[in-house]
A protein has these predicted regions:
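Hydrophobic alpha-helical connector segments
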Residues: 53, 67-98, 151
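Short secondary-structure transition hinges
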Residues: 93-127, 135-138
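Hydrophobic/aromatic residues within well-ordered alpha-helical segments
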Residues: 47, 58, 62, 84, ...
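C-terminal peripheral helix-coil segments that are non-catalytic and often amphipathic
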Residues: 124, 128-132, 136, 161, ...
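Hydrophobic recognition helices of helix-based DNA-binding modules
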Residues: 58, 62, 66, 92, ...
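All-alpha amphipathic helical-bundle segments outside canonical DNA-binding/catalytic cores
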Residues: 79, 114-118, 131, 135-151, ...
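Helix-turn-helix
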Residues: 7, 15-49, 53-57
């Protein structure tokens, strides 16, 4: 039964990405899946509920991938940190469809809920990396968890769709300011967080 539910989600997500959420109908999902209408409604009461489930699944996959980077002791501390944060990028996890839906004005509450989940769970994944950085002498802070919360909150706001609209020189200025912020909060050497440059630029492209 679970496999059929995932099949519906996979098929619907493909259609949403190809055609757009508003342009995709339940009838088209039924035609693509070749399942009975009653079967689909057994799992989902509406197209919106299907998208909610896709978003929830996307978030869970992002957390799983992020945790894998955090736990990989074969990587350097900064590689684990950058990899873990890159994995939390929902756009790269599932393509543009999910974020395009979240960014619609009518979905503001859903977007806020998604960000809240990220802000609640991501620091728990990233905290051991920061603690390893402190132990290694690469970072220093009395407030590692709170620092992560503030950095993640700022990142969600600063490097979203509004960042893409900035001219290149303004983007670079904001990126350099973010690196300065990281180095200041964690009392790290200059250049330590430079790998974040490519991460943010990739996420925002």
């Amino acid at each position: 039964m679970a496999n059929k539910k995932d099949f519906i989600l996979d098929t619907a997500q493909k259609l949403f990405m190809e055609q757009g959420f508003d342009q995709t109908s339940i009838s088209q999902i039924l035609e693509a899946t070749q399942i009975a209408r009653g079967t689909l409604y057994y799992y989902f009461s509406s197209k919106e509920e299907i998208m909610d489930a896709i978003i929830e699944r996307t978030i869970e996959r992002a957390f799983t991938a992020s945790q894998a980077f955090a736990d990989n002791r074969g990587l350097t501390i900064i590689e684990r940190l950058v990899g873990s944060m890159a994995a939390l990028n929902l756009n790269h996890q599932e393509g543009e469809g999910v974020l395009l839906h979240l960014n619609q004005p009518q979905n503001a509450l859903l977007h806020e809920k998604t960000n809240q989940i990220l802000l609640e769970r991501a620091p728990q994944i990233l905290l051991p990396i920061i603690q390893d950085g402190i132990t290694a002498g690469d970072m220093r802070t009395d407030y590692p968890y709170e620092s992560l919360e503030m950095i993640l909150t700022y990142s969600l706001q600063a490097f979203g769709s509004s960042f893409q609209a900035l001219p290149p020189e303004k983007q670079q200025q904001k990126l350099q300011a973010f690196l300065y912020l990281l180095e200041t909060i964690f009392h790290s050497r200059q250049g330590y967080f430079n790998p974040f440059l490519s991460l943010i630029q990739t996420q925002s492209s």
